Amino acid sequence: MKDEQLFYFEESSIFKAMMHFSLPMMIGSLLSVIYGILNIYFIGFLDNSHMISAISLTLPIFAVLMAFGNLFGVGGGTYISRLLGAKDYIKSHYVSSFSIYSSLVLGLIIAVITLPFTDQIASILCASGETLNYTSDYLKIEFLSTPFVILFFVLEQFARAIGKPIISMIGMLSSVGINIILDPILIFGLHLDVVGAALGTAISNAIAGLFFIIYFSRKNETLSFNVKHAKPTKAMMQEIFKIGIPAFLMVVLMGVTGLVVNLFLATYGNYAIASYGISFRLVQFPELIIMGLSEGVVPLIAYNFVSNKTRMKDTIKVVIVSIAVIFAVCMTVVLVAGHSIVQLFSTDPQIVVLATFILKVTMTSLLLNGIGFLFTGMLQATGQGRGATIMAIAQGTVIIPVLFVLNSLFGLTGVIWSLLIAETVCAFLAMFIVYSLRNRLTVDKASLIEVE
């Protein structure tokens, strides 16, 4: 590894290292919000509600593809960071090559399986009538691009894993920028409508993925694109999947949770859904900043888990303090000006009152949410597969029984408070798991550097 990478992993101040790894991730997390609304924004100019609905309905599919990217990106990436901490650059070649080519093969398999059934999948996503055709057309392009989408997410994770978070951010920026350029050309210039929006996303992911490939092929000594290195061993696959599978499950289950929350809110009318939508988008920004902070330091924790546990512990302490400061600032703003902020999005008195209440409740959960993210990332970084799996399942399922109980007891108020209660349970569960594993957070370097 180059001296600059080693400097942030081993020598710089904790705060400086944290910002080096996390700031690009924070920006990237915020970019993901923009990425999610780009196609809807441009299609909106066509004034066709069926097209807008079609793109909205396909968002869960993109989330699932991102989850598959986590399977090898997070699983392989955290393992690579630990190998770098053990100074085993040779084995990192095998892990990276296996993960890269496996993600491509997985993408091809998904494309082959799904392409003949786009109409049926569109129906499962609740598309009907004219919307069904638009949704199916969008899905065809999305599934065709699956290998490139998954590879993009894997390589973006690898950039952070080897201490190149700025390269990760540049890759994400290029993807968003290219999409912004292509969407109007394809949608309006070539009159491709929904297909144009899908093509814009597919091409931007492919080009961003190509950027990563070119960069890593020329300027790195820790990753390998040599197919001869894509030879998995049982131990290697265990290390990758014991973290990759929980990371995959977490994204999928959290998507299911979002659908369940919407189903409960729908029983109370459009004003409840609208109020939640406003508060969700407002909380999403500080939440994504904290998520970027927590996920950004995962390579730093993974590296020092092997090389310097004191630095690892100090990193966790600094991140917790940073999360607390962000929470305090955001909570103060909401308590002082929450009502006025909500009024920027709606003038309906009923929506403003309910959205302000939801905003205060969900913002209260921000601190606990941040701790949950951090400790889950810590479990991933240190290779604690069982703990990471428990947290992934908990973050996606705990809220469901809480919703049923509180909804039956307190109605809409119970549904709203269930969000905070579920986050509280998950945060304390994460703390309990980390505490119970405190004596197991050790590593046998021989197990990391053995090359079979």
Curated annotation (Swiss-Prot):
Transmembrane segments: 26-46, 54-74, 98-118, 139-159, 170-190, 194-214, 245-265, 282-302, 318-338, 351-371, 390-410, 414-434
Membrane topology: Multi-pass membrane protein
Primary location class: membrane
Compartments (UniProt record): Cell membrane
Pfam families, sorted: MatE
Source organism superkingdom: Bacteria
Record keywords, A-Z: Antibiotic resistance, Cell membrane, Membrane, Transmembrane, Transmembrane helix, Transport
Function of the protein: Multidrug resistance efflux protein.
Protein name (database record): Multidrug export protein MepA
Organism: Staphylococcus haemolyticus (strain JCSC1435)
Source lineage: Bacteria, Bacillati, Bacillota, Bacilli, Bacillales
